[in-house]
């Protein structure tokens, strides 16, 4: 049976963002920095990549390290009232499993149920069918990224903190540096557009029954910030 979320208290919000140096992470951190009074705990591997928010601001605490080694930041993680988990990995199957499955379990274990109100977990729309159910093919035939995201979602559905977890399923994400001076890192999709541009003329010869859905990282940040700063009573 899932643990009940604590009623919102007068304590100041402390929002932990993993993958805080990434595209979605930085858009989200910036939105919360500008539009809330929450203290931000930013977990990231390379603080030099953080450009969207001032790292030395009193409202920001940098937790520098790898998601696979959270013990040095156990006390800070336990103080979080909300979590926005954007960090992920793909490419190497073992690394994907450690980051996308094992590290998520460890992160949840370090949270304090007496303090935690909500976890916003980033999955992917690629593992869902049209009825928003988990695709069996995701586990059977997916890439290491798809398989580990599907495995993690299954684990979260039966986790003791399940009632406090909100899963979001982004589609194809645009965002980042398209004009000089933009402080946000470029999403992988946006970065690929420049390389693909010389070949776009070939698209007129292609026909497909598939559909593609796009979203900008700034819009994802707005949604996540709204969720993370609104009263939450559990699923």
Give a label for each model feature.
Residues 10-38:
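N-terminal Rossmann NAD(P)H-binding glycine-rich loop of SDR-like oxidoreductase domains
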Residues 211, 215-235:
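Mid/C-terminal beta-alpha module of Rossmann-like enzyme folds, strongest
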Residues 155-182:
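Conserved beta-loop-beta element that borders a ligand/cofactor-binding pocket
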Residues 97-101, 138-158, 210-218:
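Short-chain dehydrogenase/reductase
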């Amino acid at each position: 049976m899932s643990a009940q979320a604590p009623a919102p208290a007068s304590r100041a919000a402390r929002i932990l963002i993993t993958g805080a140096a990434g595209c979605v992470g930085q858009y989200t951190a910036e939105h919360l920095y500008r539009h809330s009074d929450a203290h931000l705990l930013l977990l990231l591997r390379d603080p030099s990549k953080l450009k969207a928010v001032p790292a030395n601001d009193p409202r920001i605490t940098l937790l520098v390290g790898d998601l696979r080694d959270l013990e040095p930041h156990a006390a800070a993680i336990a103080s979080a009232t909300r979590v926005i988990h954007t960090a992920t990995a793909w490419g190497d199957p073992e690394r994907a499993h450690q980051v996308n499955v094992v590290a998520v379990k460890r992160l949840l274990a370090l949270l304090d149920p007496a303090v935690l109100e909500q976890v916003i977990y980033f999955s992917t729309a690629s593992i869902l069918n049209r009825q928003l159910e988990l695709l069996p093919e995701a586990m059977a035939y997916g890439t290491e990224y798809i398989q580990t995201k599907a495995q993690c979602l299954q684990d979260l559905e039966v986790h003791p903190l399940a009632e406090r977890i909100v899963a979001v399923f982004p589609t194809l994400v645009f965002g980042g540096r398209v004009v000089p001076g933009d402080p946000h890192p470029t999403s992988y999709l946006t970065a690929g557009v420049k390389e693909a541009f010389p070949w776009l003329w070939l698209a007129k010869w292609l026909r497909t029954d598939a559909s593609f859905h796009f979203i900008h990282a700034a819009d994802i940040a707005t949604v996540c910030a709204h969720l993370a700063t609104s009263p939450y009573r559990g699923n």
